[in-house]
């Protein structure tokens, strides 16, 4: 599993961190003895604060809010908030759908239809195992939409 390094920070200002998350790294709550991205970034911010104020004792934990997540096996880009104001604004963007998320995947098989295809599923989250599963429509599941468009067709993979 790849860990976190300084080069994984794609953009940083006073309000946000935009970070490349490697496949295999948990965003939060990694198993005991494993580093997750949230704590790696907290360590980075604490080290940065110590470097900016040498000789001063730093006991305050830096503020960092997870704005959205990616599953542990998924590689991608995440946005973290560095203060409460940014966390509130970014959280509203996630909630009202103005923050756009895109996923790219390599799939096996043939896509029959051209253009954008829309899939509707119903998901139930299991908090104990931190997993979600697809359930039948009309059950307790929350609706989830996936829009799929083939960008490229590769032969003989």
Please describe what each predicted stretch is.
Residues 147, 152-157:
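Single conserved hydrophobic/aromatic residue that forms the stacking wall/gate
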Residues 1-149:
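RNA pseudouridine synthases
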């Amino acid at each position: 599993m790849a860990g976190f390094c300084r080069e994984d920070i794609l953009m940083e200002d006073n309000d946000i961190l935009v970070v490349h998350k490697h496949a295999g790294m948990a965003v939060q709550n990694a198993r005991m003895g494993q580093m997750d991205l949230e704590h790696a970034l907290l360590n980075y911010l604490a080290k940065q604060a110590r470097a900016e104020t040498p000789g001063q004792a730093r006991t305050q934990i830096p503020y960092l809010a997870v704005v959205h997540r990616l599953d542990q096996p998924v590689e991608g880009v995440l946005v973290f908030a560095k203060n409460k104001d940014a966390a509130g604004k970014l959280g509203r963007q996630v909630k009202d759908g103005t923050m756009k998320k895109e996923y790219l995947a390599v799939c096996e098989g043939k896509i029959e239809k051209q253009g954008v295809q829309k899939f509707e599923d119903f998901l139930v989250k299991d908090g104990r195992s931190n997993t979600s599963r697809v359930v039948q429509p009309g059950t307790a599941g929350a609706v989830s939409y996936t829009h799929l468009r083939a960008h490229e067709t590769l032969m003989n993979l």
